[in-house]
């Protein structure tokens, strides 16, 4: 007759322990939640709200409806920045990530010097984008024209002002971030190294060729790493500022204009409502990229 009481008491004790554990979990999560609300959620909400106002940063914001967005979409610089972003994203998703992934598969074969090469590939990750922009500014600078002198060895009449002539300026700016493909290499290579060796042995026993093993086993198992690389590469193009600001400042004309340059220009002109409207567009484009890439690469599915 006492057994049910013992079971009930045991269950209530376990229930109290679980509630106690949940309290500690919530307590430890509280600082993170507060930081997230104060420094992420609240600023995002403020940006959305003030994008519908006329605000100079000093006086109280005045509601202006859709005026900032109307001015934004009627601005040729904004439309050009969207066009540039589309082509930069296209280059990033294909050439940038594709080349980085290809190099990862080559290094996975462990050729001679592959460890040293992997170490060298860490260099772009520890040098700031501004520093790399200054290096490329020296390479393409019209006073030194390092690249032009090299090309003149083949074509003596070659003379291009890379950062000041269209369409060369666009591709010169593009070259300032293409070398970051080596970071893609490191990310994908890490996933390749984690693939169990048993899968390769089983594939060889089943008669799979090298290409079949790559296509049907390695690439599917690396889709999360490749998808993450695509997301990081595309969102970096949205926020790209240093490479443009230190080289072309969006010129010539608007040929290298970007959303981040428009946003900063709005702040410098004390048009905070307009700048926040640009920020909202950048935020929405980032969400769209995240949703599309996540859907294409099925990153929410388990690899094993």
Regions found by a protein language model. Give the residues of each.
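Short, Lys/Arg-rich, polar N-terminal cytosolic tail immediately upstream
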Residues: 1-19
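A structural signal for multi-pass alpha-helical bundles of membrane permease subunits
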Residues: 21-304
